[in-house]
Amino acid sequence: MATVIFVVKMMPDSPEADLEAIKTEAKSRLAKMGATQVSFEEKPIAFGLKAIMAQFVMPEEKGSDIVENELSSIPHVSSATIEEYRRTFG
């Protein structure tokens, strides 16, 4: 069973969105999908808006579409796009 490293960019719907609540919900949903080694980084975009960059490891057979759909359905997340998708070795 191969594993992959994902980097997903989640865009909140406004600069006032609670980023910590989004991260907590994302971590919970990712864990239910079998993701491990979940980490987050906030990346400034413009006018006070920050993207949340989520990095995690997940079994390859889960697929990438389910990840985008699940994370984009979090309240106050306007979009979730996969920025990186790499197969791991070892």
Region locations from a protein language model:
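Long, contiguous binding/interaction regions
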Residues: 1-90
